[in-house]
């Protein structure tokens, strides 16, 4: 849980990976209080960016895409990952 008041902790650009997942969708509106620009990333489609947001579809296993994703980012909330509990095809279903 974020416990520091947004008025004292503010980043220019904050990156949220795994933004299309359950936790990412829950944190998306809350994290906007902690930054001027919230950069959202996932390999799955994301809803369109709203004011103060950037959306970037990225495969985290692609080094060049990740380096581009991190450009001018001050902080990262990393929720992106691949499920090991189920085969990838079942996770996507």
Summary of predicted features, one role per range:
Residues 53, 60-93:
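NAD(P)H-binding glycine-rich loop region in Rossmannoid oxidoreductase-like domains
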Residues 11, 35, 51-53, 73:
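Short, well-ordered alpha-helix to beta-strand connector turns
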Residues 25-27, 50, 87-89:
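Short glycine-/acidic-enriched loop or helix-start segments at secondary-structure transitions
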Residues 36-47:
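Conserved glycine-rich Rossmann-like NAD(P)H-binding loop of the short-chain dehydrogenase/reductase
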Residues 17, 41, 76-80:
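SDR active-site strand-loop-helix element
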Residues 20-22, 45-46, 82-83:
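Short, solvent-exposed loop/turn segments at secondary-structure junctions
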Residues 40, 54-56:
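Conserved beta-strand scaffold positions in the cores of enzyme catalytic domains, especially
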Residues 2-34:
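N-terminal Rossmann NAD(P)H-binding glycine-rich loop of SDR-like oxidoreductase domains
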